[in-house]
């Protein structure tokens, strides 16, 4: 089986790794980065991904970032490039870029991947991630939770050690905490909790809000309505946040943020901590809930692992230390651990890594709506997956011909307060008094955490089964169409690059040809130089017209003409260089030479003696 790459599809940054020998290795991107910004931009019809997209975000309004926060939102669309894109499509562009540079590194086609998701992602978000992989041309072998992947990266070389681990994962847009037990190569998740809308972006937003409010007070101008100003503020807020992880203050300088007005502020670490205190506090709840669900106290925890770039914030580290009573373990890179863990899981699937078993859990309870709008749970949160569970229900009215199955995910007692995963109907139930029909509802969760539900009339044997497909989720036809679109975009991008390369070659050829003509001067006649000059003029015209085929044709013509000119120069240089080796005027023997000159002044053969270098010693 070919290699399975591990991808951390992050809110702010993404990373990819592969197993090499006994250890996972991060694959660097074309810019040399170990992580790639999860940013997509559209420029003149071209799709840009990663560093190049992020660099021009300030000047390009068609730049999309943090799309992960909208995965699974059925009605969310991004307008760009004259089209509307779903979050899955934008994510697929990031995955496609990662797939390409992984292939360049490995020197082979990559078909399979393990992709990570926040532990607290619901079914719709997981399915959307899997769809994004499919659109990008990847067979998603497994969806695994980010904290679990980080634990794999941490524990791969500690398989013989029994320990309980708390993984605190605060990324760019999501927060997870998982409690795991490691022993004899088994990584068992005991519980998980989190917040899919808490991350580094929220810390940035606090700084942005502070700057906007302060600027409005001082100048009476509201920058929150200026998209260009907001992008500049976002960039500076992120830089200030990173600076404050190692320094006590950060300078924020934004000249001409509005007309001739500037921002010149100093943000201290103490101010930043005050601005973001509620976010740090908000992260404590999921930690406490996860510990409670695992049935453990903090004294039972052997290691606290920090994962995600936002765990570099000193106030976050202090909060974790205060809450758990333990010094966090910094042995793994918080930006890379998840991708490394995903690569390990890929190697477990291929059989390249043995003696490792991963037992993950479902993050949220699953059930159906029953009489009175109540949610009746069939599978409780933190149940080890894969799993299945069945329960028998009945009709709510006499002679009821059909049963509507409303599938829910969440922890609230009332159906309306939970997440709807889907609806389906079991029909043709024979007429019978209320409570008599026996309807067996079965839930099945696979290793990816994706849910299937079936309902069966035990009296007739009639059944109905669905893999949860929200109305907003992608159908197979839609996915196939997007796969084709992605492939055509790849072809268009390839064509665009070829055009750019051609233009660069043309510019170089024009420059070198003009230089050659200038250097030739009077060494050759106009008749020799004319074919090159004519071909050069033709190529310049073709360059202005931007007709690719004509440009190729004229480029080839100039190259041939320039080559012919070079041959003539070489031929002329031959006799000249031979003559230059003599010390007299052309046509005469040099002084003291043994050459003889005829009466007509022409040079005739002269005697010469070969000098042996040894004779000079």
Swiss-Prot record:
Q: Would I find Lipoprotein among this entry's keywords? A: no
Task: Spell out the InterPro entries in the cross-references.
Answer: ATPase_NBD, Chaperone_DnaK, Heat_shock_70_CS, HSP70_C_sf, HSP70_peptide-bd_sf, Hsp_70_fam
Q: Which domain of life is it from?
A: Bacteria
The record's induction entry says: By stress conditions e.g. heat shock.
On this chain, the residues bearing Phosphothreonine are: 174
Q: Where is the composition biased (Basic and acidic residues)?
A: 596-617
Which CDD domains did the record assign?
Answer: ASKHA_NBD_HSP70_DnaK-like
List the GO molecular function terms. Answer: ATP binding; ATP-dependent protein folding chaperone; unfolded protein binding
The protein's name: Chaperone protein DnaK
What lineage does the source organism belong to?
Bacteria, Bacillati, Bacillota, Bacilli, Lactobacillales
């Amino acid at each position: 089986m070919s290699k399975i790459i591990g991808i951390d599809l992050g809110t702010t940054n993404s990373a990819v790794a592969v197993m090499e020998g006994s250890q996972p290795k991060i694959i660097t991107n074309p810019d040399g980065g170990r992580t790639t910004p999860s940013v997509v931009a559209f420029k003149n019809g071209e799709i840009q991904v990663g560093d190049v997209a992020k660099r021009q975000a300030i000047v390009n309004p068609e730049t999309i970032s943090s799309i992960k926060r909208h995965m699974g939102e059925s009605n969310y669309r991004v307008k760009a490039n004259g089209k509307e894109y779903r979050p899955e499509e934008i994510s697929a562009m990031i995955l496609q870029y990662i797939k390409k540079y992984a292939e360049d590194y490995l020197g082979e086609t990559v078909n399979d991947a393990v992709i990570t998701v926040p532990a607290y992602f619901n079914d719709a978000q997981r399915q959307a991630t899997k769809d994004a992989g499919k659109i990008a041309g990847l067979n998603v072998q497994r969806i695994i939770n980010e904290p679990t992947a980080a634990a794999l990266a941490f524990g791969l070389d500690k398989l013989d050690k029994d320990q309980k681990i708390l993984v605190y994962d605060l990324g760019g847009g999501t927060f997870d905490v998982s409690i795991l037990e490691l022993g004899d190569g088994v990584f068992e998740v005991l519980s998980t909790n989190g917040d899919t809308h808490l991350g580094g972006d929220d810390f940035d937003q606090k700084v942005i809000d502070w700057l906007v409010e302060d600027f409005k007070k001082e100048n009476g101008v509201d920058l929150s309505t200026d998209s260009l100003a907001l992008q500049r503020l976002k960039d500076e807020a992120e830089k200030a946040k990173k600076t404050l992880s190692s320094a006590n203050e950060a300078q924020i300088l934004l000249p001409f943020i509005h007309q001739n007005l500037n921002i010149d502020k100093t943000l201290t670490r103490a101010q930043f901590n005050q601005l973001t205190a509620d976010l740090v506090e908000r992260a404590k709840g999921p930690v406490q809930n996860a510990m409670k669900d695992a049935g453990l106290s903090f004294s039972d925890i052997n290691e606290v692992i920090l994962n995600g770039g936002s765990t570099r914030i000193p106030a976050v580290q202090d909060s974790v230390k205060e809450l758990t009573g333990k010094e966090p373990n910094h042995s793994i890179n918080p930006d890379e651990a998840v991708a490394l863990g995903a690569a390990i899981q890929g190697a477990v699937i291929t059989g390249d890594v043995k003696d490792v078993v991963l037992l993950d859990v479902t993050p949220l309870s699953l059930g159906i709506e029953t009489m009175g709008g109540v949610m009746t749970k069939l599978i409780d949160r933190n149940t080890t997956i894969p799993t299945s569970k069945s329960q028998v229900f009945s009709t709510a009215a006499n002679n009821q011909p059909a049963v509507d199955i409303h599938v829910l995910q969440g922890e609230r007692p009332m159906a309306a307060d939970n997440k709807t995963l889907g609806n389906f109907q079991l029909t043709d139930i024979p007429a019978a008094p209320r409570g008599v029909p026996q309807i067996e509802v079965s839930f099945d969760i696979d290793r990816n955490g994706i849910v299937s539900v079936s309902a069966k009339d035990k009296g007739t044997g009639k059944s109905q089964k669905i893999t949860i497909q929200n109305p907003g989720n992608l159908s197979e036809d839609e996915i196939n169409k997007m796969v084709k679109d992605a492939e055509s975009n790849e072809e268009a991008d390839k064509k665009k690059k070829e055009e750019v390369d051609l233009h660069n070659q043309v510019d170089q050829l024009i420059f070198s040809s003009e230089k050659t003509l200038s250097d030739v001067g009077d060494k050759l006649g106009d008749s020799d130089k004319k074919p090159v000059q004519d071909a050069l003029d033709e190529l310049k015209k073709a360059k202005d017209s931007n007709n690719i085929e004509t440009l190729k044709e004229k480029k080839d013509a100039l190259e041939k003409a320039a080559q012919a000119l070079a041959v003539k120069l070489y031929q002329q240089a031959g006799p000249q260089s031979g003559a230059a080796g003599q010390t007299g005027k052309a046509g005469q023997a040099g002084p003291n030479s043994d050459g003889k000159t005829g009466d007509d002044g022409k040079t005739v053969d002269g005697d010469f003696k070969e000098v042996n270098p040894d004779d000079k010693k």
